[in-house]
Design a protein with these regions (language model features):
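An acidic/histidine-cluster motif and surrounding catalytic segment
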Residues: 1-91, 95-238
């Protein structure tokens, strides 16, 4: 298994990516940083180059090009996994490993190990214990509720890449949905959780038809939460 944490070339991203790496190292996982794609890299061109698809649905997001860049970062690793011979654990920089990692996990093709990071999917512990069995479960929600900790096999990555070639492309977590893929699973209790104080992708809407994306996040303090431009204060940025 190869492990990557998607990291923007920005001091705050490096800081929390290091936290992610350290949390994983405590349980014997070696995680490498993967340089995130940002809007300045023309993410839509990267998506089209990999998939051949030009149909994308990002424009309702507060920052469409940031969401496209997030998808392009994930997609690049999916593409790399599809050509490899072992599973990839793909982490986002604000993921933290807080529960035991299932080193001997047996799963189908693609599974989330991350606690839902948005929406109303976190019930009481008593309800969750009735809803889930310990270990691998069929995905209980319509899509991955955050792509902060996804484990996939090359064969799963291949199917995802192939479908991305002819389906409408949307934000990375909602793209990994049961409508498209019947093999999606989730591990319970979720080993990874998002610990975030800022976002380089999401924000509140400023225009008609745009989505408010901060208010549906879990475990954040909206009074102190920051929205940061991923192309601001980047090292060696021309």
């Amino acid at each position: 298994m190869k492990c990557f944490v998607i990291t923007v070339d920005h001091p705050k991203s490096h800081e929390i990516a290091d936290r992610c790496i350290e949390s994983c190292a405590k349980q014997g996982l070696h995680v490498e940083k993967f340089n995130a794609i940002t809007p300045k890299d023309n993410p839509r061109e990267i998506i089209t180059k990999i998939t051949g698809n030009t149909k994308m649905n990002f424009d309702m997001e507060p920052f469409p090009e940031r969401v496209a860049a997030c998808f392009a970062s994930q997609l690049t690793l999916w593409d790399r996994c599809s050509k490899d011979t072992e599973p990839y654990l793909i982490l986002e920089h604000d993921a933290v490993l807080e529960l035991p990692f299932p080193h001997d996990i047996e799963f189908d093709k693609c599974i989330t190990l991350g606690r839902p990071s948005w929406g109303t999917f976190l019930d009481s512990p008593q309800t969750l214990s009735k809803k889930y069995s310990n270990g691998v479960n069929k995905l209980k929600t319509h899509c991955f509720i955050g792509n902060h900790a996804v484990l996939m096999k090359p064969e799963g990555a291949k199917e995802i890449i192939e479908l991305a070639g002819h389906k409408l492309i949307e934000p990375a977590d909602t793209f990994l949905c049961q409508f498209y893929f019947n093999f999606l699973e989730e591990y319970f209790p979720w080993p990874f959780v998002v610990r975030e104080t800022f976002s380089m992708i999401q924000g509140d809407a400023k225009g008609d038809g745009k989505a408010n994306t901060l208010h549906i996040k879990n475990n954040i303090d909206l009074w102190t939460y920051e929205v940061i431009d991923p192309d601001e204060n980047i090292h060696n940025n021309d």
